[in-house]
Each structure stands twice: as C-alpha cells, then as structure tokens.
C-alpha cells in the first residue's frame, strides 16, 4: 500500500511539473474547425520574428473577442440604419431627434432586437488577419514612427483589429483614405490626434442610443451619426490606422 501511495505521489508530482498549455495553444484549440486559418497566419510569418509575435498576440487574445450582430439581413433596425437622413437639426434632444423617431416606430413592429454572437476565433480568416498586421506594421515603420513607442505599446494600442463588439470590417482601408495625408506629420503625434479629433465627421445623436447594435467603422463613416461610444470607437480606430496608439476608457 505504501509503495502504491509513493507511486501515485510521483505521478502527481510529475504532471504538476509539466508546463501548462500556452495561451496560443489554448486559442488554437478553441478555434475548432477554424484552426487552419490561424495556423496559416503563423506559417506566413514564421521567418519574421516581430510579425510572428504580433500574430501570436492577436490569436492569443482572440477567444474573448466577438461581434454582436443582427440575427439576419431582414432585421428592421439594420435596414433602417442604411436609409437614415444625415440631417437632424435637434440631435442632442432624444425627444425631438428624427433618428430617435425612426427607431421608436420600428420598436412597435419589432419590439426586441434579435442578435447573434459571432466569435472571432471561429470565423477569422487568414487573409483578414494578415492584412491587418501588414497595415499596422506599415504605418508603424513609416518615417521613424516606431521610435515614439515600444513594440508592446504597438501590440496593445495600434495592432488590434477591433475596439468593442462591432462587425469586423476593413476599417484600416477606409481610415487611411480619410486620414492618410496625416502620415507625413506623425513626428508630432499629439497635434495630429488633436486635429483629427476636431475634424472627424461623426457627430453625436441621442437618437442613436435606440439603435440596438454596434455600428461598423464604415457605417459610422457613412451615416456620420453616433452615440458617445460610437464617436470614441471611430476616433480610436482612425488614430490606430495611421499609427497613433489609442484606446477607449470609461470616465
């Protein structure tokens, strides 16, 4: 009996000394059928140390990332969003906002929003992730921008492909088209950030608080209305797209 207990103790001690699975391994396991897409990214960057580390950073954090989307394309709220008028003279007062009136009328037809949760780890494509990494590194390496902040800051505040639970989109392309001309001024990043904050197009509309989903960057750019959260997300992504570290916070 004593010999058996000694054996069990040794086995237990052996397994307790084994290293835990890495965050990367856990993420790849959670990807399930989508694992191959993520492994394509790792293989693509196997000879580039920094970009490989960046890919690992995104994949390791991916299990907690997801989008909140309308259940299907027939969702009345989502369809109405595309046809909202950009002119709303009393946007600050929800009781007089034309946007609020539109969503109030929809709530009588569709009382509850119908959502679905889509996990990034299960749908992320290698093409999307590689494009995001390449675009982020391109602006980071431009004209000595990298000297202003560390690689760790780059991974945390420039590299991420989302800020909340918005739909995945090619927001870097859109933002670069709008703000790419600021790239030549990045030796003064604080001035650039201040200028963009003063000029960016998304305006507050209290009526948008009645919209039950989160807009994509392109939707915000097109509609030019949003909540405080929308405006914050739009500015954060705009700054990241040109290589200025940015994040959102609750005040």
Please provide the spans of the model-predicted regions.
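Generic structural signal for short, flexible, solvent-exposed coil/loop and linker residues
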Residues: 3-6, 118, 160, 217, ...
């Amino acid at each position: 009996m004593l010999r058996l207990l000694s054996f069990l103790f040794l086995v237990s001690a052996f397994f307790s000394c084994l290293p835990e699975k890495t965050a990367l391994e856990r993420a790849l396991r959670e990807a399930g059928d989508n694992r191959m897409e993520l492994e394509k990214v790792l293989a693509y960057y196997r000879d580039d140390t920094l970009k490989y580390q960046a890919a690992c950073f995104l994949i390791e954090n991916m299990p907690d990332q997801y989008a909140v989307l309308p259940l299907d394309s027939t969702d009345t709220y989502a369809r109405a969003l595309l046809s909202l008028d950009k002119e709303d003279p009393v946007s600050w007062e929800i009781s007089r906002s034309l946007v609020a009136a539109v969503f109030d009328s929809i709530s009588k037809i569709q009382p509850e929003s119908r959502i679905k949760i889509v996990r990034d780890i299960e749908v992320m494509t290698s093409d999307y992730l590689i494009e995001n990494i390449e675009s982020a590194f391109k602006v980071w390496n431009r004209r000595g921008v990298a000297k202003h902040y560390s690689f760790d800051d780059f991974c945390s505040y420039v590299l991420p492909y989302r800020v909340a639970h918005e739909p995945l989109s090619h927001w870097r392309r859109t933002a670069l088209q709008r703000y790419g001309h600021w790239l030549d001024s990045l030796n003064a990043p604080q001035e650039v950030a201040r200028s963009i904050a003063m000029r960016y197009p998304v305006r507050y509309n209290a009526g948008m608080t009645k919209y039950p989903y989160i807009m994509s960057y392109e939707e915000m750019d097109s509609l030019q209305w949003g909540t405080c959260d929308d405006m914050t997300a739009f500015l954060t992504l705009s700054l990241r797209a040109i290589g200025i570290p940015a994040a959102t916070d609750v005040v």
